[in-house]
Amino acid sequence: MMKKTVVIGLAVVVLAAVVAGGYWWYQSRQDNGLTLYGNVDIRTVNLSFRVGGRVESLAVDEGDAIKAGQVLGELDHKPYEIALMQAKAGVSVAQAQYDLMLAGYRDEEIAQAAAAVKQAQAAYDYAQNFYNRQQGLWKSRTISANDLENARSSRDQAQATLKSAQDKLRQYRSGNREQDIAQAKASLEQAQAQLAQAELNLQDSTLIAPSDGTLLTRAVEPGTVLNEGGTVFTVSLTRPVWVRAYVDERNLDQAQPGRKVLLYTDGRPDKPYHGQIGFVSPTAEFTPKTVETPDLRTDLVYRLRIVVTDADDALRQGMPVTVQFGDEAGHE
């Protein structure tokens, strides 16, 4: 009987040891796994035309899924098409002027300028000789001082005409001045810039989706006259999907960039999403009121941004998420 009692006692001791060991192992596993609480953070963007005008058409409505590169809406293109035509004409004029400056003067123009110099030289010689004769007559008191002054004036005018013709011939032979060529080139570049701006304005009168997403709001309707930058749509981006969470300083070493984690939602507690820490704030901040934690050991925390690598449409903006660290979550 005593032997049986001893055996039973030993069995109880062994069983208690097994239970205690199992509990210790379970607790150690729990202690090694950090748990944080955060919320889904999906970026939204306000889409607008970069230029103003009358809304011609809108191709999507609230709730529609959109794809990157999809045409979402258009303004009335006519004003921008007219501006583009004017800019092209301006480039043509400036290009022609610049080409003329580079080419210089034709042989025919140089010959005409040389002939003008000869004609001006002959006129000057005649005026100079006439003045000389009038000067002699004035000395002999044959003509008045007024007659002499008229002869001098005619001589001076002929001299000025000759100098102008000589300067023009010299310019024709040497070509256009570098300053004039540079000015013509600058005018051409300005016209080309205006053309590029006109092309861009016409392009921006069509609103293109920058990325995949879901249309949340449609702020205007066709016929609305918009100023540039006026919001037309608000879009929730499909990617990336992040979880915003906070970690205290004591556990900061476990939350390093690249660390993989599991993300649990109330809707699928047995099928976690997978995430990877992409950003850890370099500065501490006071615990936000929205943070849900079972035990905050400090008022200062560090913000985490966790990228959800297998996100789907079930994740919604602001949805609460449990972030589980541990060996099962894996590391980089």
Swiss-Prot record:
SUPFAM superfamilies: HlyD-like secretion proteins
InterPro entries assigned to the protein according to its UniProt record, in alphabetical order: CusB_D23, UPF0194_membrane_YbhG, UPF0194_transport
Disulfide bridge partners, by residue number: none
Keyword Signal tagged: yes
GO cellular component: periplasmic space
Coiled coil region boundaries: 108-209
Pfam families, alphabetized: HlyD_D23
Cellular compartments annotated: Periplasm
Keyword Coiled coil attached: yes
Keywords: Coiled coil, Periplasm, Signal
Signal peptide range: 1-16
Listed PANTHER family: EFFLUX SYSTEM COMPONENT YKNX-RELATED, UPF0194 MEMBRANE PROTEIN YBHG
NCBIfam families: PRK03598.1
Family to which the UniProt record says this protein belongs: Belongs to the UPF0194 family.
Name the record gives this protein: UPF0194 membrane protein YbhG
Provenance organism: Shigella dysenteriae serotype 1 (strain Sd197)
Primary gene name: ybhG
